[in-house]
Design a protein with these regions (language model features):
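Short structural boundary motif marking the start of a folded domain
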Residues: 1-5
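Short N-terminal binding/cap micro-motifs at the start of the first secondary-structure element
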Residues: 11-18, 46-47
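Short, charged/polar "capping" segments at the starts of alpha-helices
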Residues: 14, 84, 181-185
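Short glycine/threonine/proline-enriched tight-turn/helix- or strand-capping micro-motif at secondary-structure
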Residues: 15-26, 55
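Glycine-rich beta-strand-centered segment in the early N-terminal region that forms part
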Residues: 26-44, 52-96
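NAD(P)H dinucleotide-binding glycine-rich loop of Rossmann-like/cofactor-binding domains
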Residues: 68-75, 85-152
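Mid-domain Rossmann-like dinucleotide-binding core that forms the NAD(H)/NADP(H) cofactor-binding site
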Residues: 122-192
Length: 192
């Protein structure tokens, strides 16, 4: 049995329980090039809210009546993708469900899964951490001694950018956050 949350209505403002529907049924069998992943962890990233909008934000919008899209982590339990055999621990784009069926290209194998806490692959070692690293070092070209300004300093990506900048030898790291509570968090928790 697969339990999953479907998006049935586009949220207006903060999502409400009535925007979702709970469904139980069999997991969809994988098609050619697809895998079924038993979802162990779901990243509850703020980006999901944008994917619920008709514009999809920077991503294809979640179709109404479909499972809510999210970054998930778990083992492959069925595979029609030779790159991801059954038993491979993966992280990628799945859904709010017990089992996510999706193209194998949506997932990457988790390397050295036995050497790290698995949830780390959803944040610092996963898409959020890769985004922070790519933005800071590949796009911005940060070098030792640079001063770094981080917008969205208390968010998932921003908080990691700040830590990477400090560890990378930035001379100064300054964070921008929305409001006194987030600014206090930036200083007291993230050490700006």
């Amino acid at each position: 049995t697969n339990r999953e949350w479907l998006l049935v209505k586009r949220p207006q403002g903060l999502p409400q329980r009535s925007d979702y529907e709970w469904r139980e049924g069999p997991a969809r069998a994988p098609g050619e090039g697809e895998v079924v992943v038993r979802v162990l962890y779901i990243a509850m990233d703020p980006a999901i809210r944008g994917w619920m909008d008709p514009s999809g934000n920077y991503f294809t919008p979640i179709p109404l009546g479909s499972p809510v899209t999210a970054v998930v982590l778990g083992p492959v339990v069925e595979s029609r993708d030779p790159r991801l055999p059954v038993g491979t621990m993966v992280c990628g784009l799945g859904s709010w469900s017990d089992y996510a069926t999706a193209p194998g290209l949506f997932f990457n194998p988790v390397v050295d899964a036995d050497q790290h806490d698995l949830v780390a692959f959803l944040h610092p070692l996963g898409p959020v951490g890769l985004t922070a690293h790519y933005g800071l070092f590949d796009r911005a070209g940060m070098k030792k001694g640079d001063a770094v300004l981080v917008s969205g300093a208390t968010g998932g990506v921003g908080s990691l950018v700040a830590q990477m900048a400090r560890l990378g030898g930035a001379s100064k790291v300054v964070g921008i956050a929305g409001g006194p509570v987030k600014c206090r968090q930036a200083v007291e928790v993230f050490g700006y």
